[in-house]
Amino acid sequence: MSLIDPPGCKDIDDTLHCIVLPNGNYQVGVSIADVTHYVSPGSAMDLEAASRSTSTYLVNKRLDMLPALLTTDLCSLRANVDRYAFSVIWEVTPDGDIKNVDFKKTIIHSIAALTYQQAQSFIDQPDSQSDDPQVGAVKRLATLARIFRKKRIDAGALTLASPEVKFVLDSESLNPTDVQAYTLMEANALVEEFMLLANITVAKKILRNYPTLSVLRRHPSPNRAMFESLISKARCRGFEIDIENSKRLADSLDAAQLESEPYFNKLLRILSTRCMSPAQYFCSGEYRPMDWHHYGLAAPVYTHFTSPIRR
């Protein structure tokens, strides 16, 4: 098991592993902290977590959904200790075809805690320069993540932009002294891709077992009126934005490029994000299956299996 998280992250709720099987395929696993081992349904802790709903991350501190003893210790999937987890384990070919999937309650022991920068350095290493099994595992995961990402985008998943910044604070006054853009790397996309795959896989699993009682997450198709301003602005620069479906929107955004203004496309994607309908949690029995889809991810079903420590 390997952890890939930001530097200093303490509430670690996911790990990844990738093992080469005797038949040449890969065993790929996403393991998520088993919060239910410590929090019983209907308990005082469960009710308090429900009222908070999520952990809140401020510039200089974090307001936890669950007590710190759980979030940063007992439930946190830290390296070199045993932890309770739920695992989704796939058998995947080197070409990215999923052969089968299994779901298990597990006890995991993470052997490496990597920052995104460290994971990126593994990805960037030439294949011939390292025999380290951790490097090999991360490189295989990166290769699969690229394949899965391409499949999602080809199916119509959107690649939008949301500017992220981090503040540097004065150690005494806590006043901001600098603001820096947060740089996303391929290692970030690697983790994101497998979390999305886990959430989609679990959504399908719970629907098979609880067809009318599954808690899912839907993203309705946007209303055209919400996009009118953006469509008008893009048309002024000679581009047509098509929102008939997510694939057409993705293709029209990809085509809206100005060599003289390299940030034009990113600006369009930021504005597109603001035109979207909000995603919603819902019970599968409340909507028709055609209304379960997640527009932004181009996924017929989706849920939030990951991040149980913080939501």
Task: Give the predicted meaning of each segment.
Residues 1-311:
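Electropositive polyanion-binding surfaces
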